[in-house]
């Protein structure tokens, strides 16, 4: 009986101290595969999960935050115990430029529109109003053919879903 009484007393005191400790809290998030500016954007978006328990991470919310960024093609999440989260990100490749509603946008290999990024390399321009999936289908056909994608100067899309290519 005395052992049970001592267990209750010391267990209660230790539980009070145990609750004050920040065990298993995420203290550091490492992002691999992006430049510093893109890392800052992702880290700002991830602030809500930074101090959560590493064992209780809601992957649905984490994936939703990461997938909402148009420049991310894919990502992998690794837990480094006791308090670090590593996120390996593959950045999307810019495939073409398109004018949508008077704005110059880029189409990424992830099928999303990206806002005007400062790019120093030449990309083909798409004239017309295609669906992104139609363009990605054409891109895969070009990749399987003898035509080099780098040789394409412009794409012309017609309402009949016909594509014309202008080569350099």
What does each model-identified segment do?
Residues 1, 21-23, 157:
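Extreme N-terminal "leader" segments
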Residues 1-14:
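Hydrophobic membrane-insertion alpha-helices, especially the h-region
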Residues 85-159:
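Extracytoplasmic segments of membrane-associated envelope/inner-membrane machinery
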Residues 12-118:
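Terminal hydrophobic membrane-targeting helix
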Residues 27, 122, 161-163:
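A generic secondary-structure signal marking the coil-to-beta-strand transition
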Residues 164-168:
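Short, intrinsically disordered, charge-balanced linker/junction segments flanking boundaries
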């Amino acid at each position: 009986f005395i052992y049970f009484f001592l267990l209750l007393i010391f267990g209660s005191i230790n539980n009070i101290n145990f609750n004050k400790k920040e065990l298993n809290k995420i203290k550091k998030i490492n992002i691999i595969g992006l430049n510093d500016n893109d890392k800052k954007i992702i880290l700002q978006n991830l602030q809500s999960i930074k101090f959560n328990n590493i064992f209780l991470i809601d992957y649905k919310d984490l994936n939703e935050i990461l997938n909402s960024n148009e420049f991310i093609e894919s990502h992998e999440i690794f837990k480094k115990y006791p308090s670090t989260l590593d996120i390996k990100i593959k950045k999307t490749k810019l495939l073409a430029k398109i004018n949508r509603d008077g704005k110059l946008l880029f189409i990424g290999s992830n099928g999303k529109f990206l806002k005007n990024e400062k790019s120093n390399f030449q990309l083909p321009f798409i004239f017309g109003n295609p669906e992104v999936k139609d363009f990605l289908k054409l891109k895969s056909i070009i990749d399987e053919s003898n035509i080099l994608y780098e040789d394409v100067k412009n794409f012309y899309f017609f309402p009949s879903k016909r594509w014309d290519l202008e080569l350099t």
